[in-house]
């Protein structure tokens, strides 16, 4: 994965696209003009500009102005098993030690991230408003990062779920307008890229043909549900009991059949790879290795597996040799440290 400044990335992509002929205009759309029931004729802008098009990409965020508000795309909420619906964010300065990784740390009613960038550290606390107020969540984050009085925090509301059909008529919803799964696995950009690539492929094959459109919508929906299952498992398998938030997550039985199948397979010694491939027609979002890491990482082993003695004759890891090899590889790269002022 990469650490990047989302604002600067947007500027870079804008410049990259315009240099290659993409027309970039800053206009405020105030209304949507419909043609047929399931198609858009034009966007009407504040300055009187009327923008016609063959395909309209709805990137209007959680408002989903075209897909949901105009075309009536159905929204499917995920609140029954993904409780978090808020985030409080607050950047901080680098400490003396510069970390080359994102930290994800459990909190009383959710979890927080710490992401090092070259000029600052991004911090955020993802939580459920059912279990903690905005004020208390901000106070908890400030205490955790040692910024009780510095900086201005922002509260972000999250609408967690997806629309039933990402491609409706001549509108493609992308980003927050098509759906959002909380950022625990940082999957938002992946879904946007997959949506763009799959749409281009489907459109080139069949234009507005309903067959290709239906298959595209099914693939995107399956991707959302596959990611959802994996993230829900993080909460369902937790073994904390210090707050009601974590107790309710551990007791939550609103699980999909696929997730129940993966948990059952793990505890009954089935082949996770076979089960995973079968559930997703050979194309799962998370490989079986990821599921192994998740289950084992939570220490959720079948009871008998905990008492089985370690087999003899196993090859022991040559830790010192591995450490020397990695150190030698590191000499090929610049030292990972913040840019000097």
Predicted segments, located by residue:
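Long, low-complexity C-terminal extensions of enzymes
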Residues: 201-341
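Short, surface-exposed, charged/polar-biased interaction segments
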Residues: 34, 77-78, 83, 109, ...
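A residue-identity detector for tryptophan
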Residues: 16, 111-113, 167, 246, ...
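Short conserved micro-motifs at the rims of enzyme active sites and ligand-binding pockets
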Residues: 100-101, 126, 183-186, 305-306
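Predominantly flavin-linked oxidoreductase catalytic cores and closely associated redox partners
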Residues: 1-143, 196
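FAD/FMN-dependent oxidoreductases across multiple families
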Residues: 118, 127-239
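Tryptophan-centric aromatic hotspots in well-structured domains and transmembrane helices
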Residues: 2, 55, 111, 167, ...
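Generic, low-specificity signal for short hydrophobic/alpha-helical stretches with a mild N-terminal bias
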Residues: 96, 123, 153-159, 174-181, ...
């Amino acid at each position: 994965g990469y650490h990047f400044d989302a604002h600067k990335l947007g500027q870079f992509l804008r410049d990259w696209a315009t240099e290659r002929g993409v027309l970039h205009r800053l206009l405020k759309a105030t209304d949507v003009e419909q043609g047929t029931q399931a198609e858009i004729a034009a966007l009407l802008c504040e300055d009187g500009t009327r923008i016609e098009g063959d395909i309209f990409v709805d990137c209007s965020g959680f408002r989903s102005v075209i897909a949901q508000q105009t075309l009536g795309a159905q929204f499917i909420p995920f609140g029954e098993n993904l409780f978090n619906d808020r985030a409080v964010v607050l950047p901080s300065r680098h400490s003396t030690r510069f970390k080359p990784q994102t930290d994800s740390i459990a909190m009383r009613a959710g979890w927080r991230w710490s992401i090092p960038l070259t000029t600052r550290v991004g911090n955020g606390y993802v939580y459920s408003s059912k279990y903690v107020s905005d004020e208390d969540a901000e106070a908890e984050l400030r205490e955790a990062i040692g910024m009780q009085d510095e900086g201005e925090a922002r509260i972000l509301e999250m609408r967690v779920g997806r629309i039933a059909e990402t491609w409706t008529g001549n509108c493609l919803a992308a980003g927050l307008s098509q759906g959002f799964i909380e950022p625990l696995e940082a999957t938002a950009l992946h879904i946007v890229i997959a949506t763009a690539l799959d749409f281009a492929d489907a459109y080139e094959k069949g234009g507005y043909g309903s067959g290709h459109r239906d298959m595209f919508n099914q693939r995107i929906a399956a991707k959302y549900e596959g990611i959802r299952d994996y993230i829900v498992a993080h909460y369902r398998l937790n073994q904390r009991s210090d707050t009601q938030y974590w107790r309710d997550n551990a007791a939550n039985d609103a699980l999909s059949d696929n997730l129940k199948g993966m948990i059952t397979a793990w505890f009954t010694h089935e082949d996770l790879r076979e089960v995973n491939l079968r559930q997703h027609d050979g194309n799962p979002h998370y490989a079986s290795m990821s599921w192994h890491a998740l289950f084992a990482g939570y220490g959720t082993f079948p009871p008998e597996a905990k008492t089985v003695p370690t087999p003899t004759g196993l090859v022991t890891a040559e830790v010192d040799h591995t450490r020397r090899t990695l150190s030698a590889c590191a000499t090929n790269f610049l030292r990972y440290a913040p840019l000097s002022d």
